[in-house]
Amino acid sequence: MSNSLRGPLEGVRVVELATVVMGPLATQILADLGAEVVKVEGSELDRSRVIGGGRHPELSGAAVNLHRNKRSIQLDLKAPEGREVMVRLLESADVFVTNLRPRSLASLGLDHETLKSSMPRLIHCAAQGYRHGSGEEDRPAYDDVIQAETGLADLSLKVGDTARYIPTLVADKVSALMLVQAAVAALWQRDARGHAARVELSMFDAVLAFHLVEHLSGATFRGGDAGYGRILNAKRGPHRTQDGLVSVLPYADRDWYELFAEVGREAELLGFPFRSERERHENADTVYSGLASVLRMRSSAEWMRLCAARGIAAAEVVGIDEIVSDPALHRGMLIDDDHPVAGPYRRIGSPFRFDGAASAIRSQAPVVGEHTIEILYELDYSEAEVEALIRHGTAGREAVAQLAPENR
């Protein structure tokens, strides 16, 4: 597979020793930006390879997207020979991305302190649940746990009767995005100033920084309350029209006038609490009730036409099954593709463009160890050495087989 643009990170080599979503998503973004990514895998299957089902035991719905533009090498890192391969691989790399806990990294000799003297240009990016040096860095942490501990789950309790997790892997994905930002900044610093940084990212810190942008709110100044009241109002959400659900966000005074005037209720805007933006924000419960009663008086299509004509932000509520099946709704972000092993699938498009062009999709997601032999030769192992590593189980190679025609 090819595209006219490889990406701004072309020439950067990234080694990934990571599982589930946070680490693999970060390296997938780096790969989409043009970096060469080598995914190091062991005998235990990365959990991301089974998320979302699929036709092949190693290529789930999540895996075919999370691991695109990567190569895979399978190594036994507990064996000295496997660690030696890993060291050679890291010596050839610019960035090392891992979400192994510090104790595990140290036991493998892959911690920053061990590697820095022999690899002074390697940017060591370690992402765990909790901050290094906190005493909690070796605690297990997954998305649900971080949502609970950072107060995200409690926010839903403030608008309903039950504490709930946000129904997407927000902690993993926010942390992945921040890790990418830090890795790219570290690359710039190394090339501009000659210093290869150790990058550390805590999921807890990332998610807390993410949601406190608005929810620190009054607690920014001691004595106030945390939580952004308008967002935490139980009546905030899509509203019913005569025939469906819509999201309509009037912000400016003029927006409110256009909506209320459409149903002959503009006089209400002269009284409390509609007279100013501050008044509306401080009395969100009453304001949302008023907006809901107005929107019930017309059909969804009528409101969409009015809002489009008046420049008011609005959309109909789209079902998840609808958006993944209708190109007009997903706006070209899902692309029909064909994997040589997993068969036909829908690929998630790249959300960014450079000079109007999408990032290149250079290769499909590999099965475990698909590129083991290829990479060993690149690291100057001889044919006899490669055969010995494979024979002893230190390095693994997955046989790549086509799906039977009935599964395609």
Question: Where are the language model's segments positioned?
Answer:
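Glycine-rich beta-alpha junction loops
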Residues: 44, 129-131, 203-208, 243-245, ...
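Short, surface-exposed loop/helix-turn segments at secondary-structure junctions
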Residues: 50-53, 216-226, 326-339
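Aromatic-enriched alpha-helical interface/lid elements that frame and gate functional surfaces
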Residues: 234-310, 314
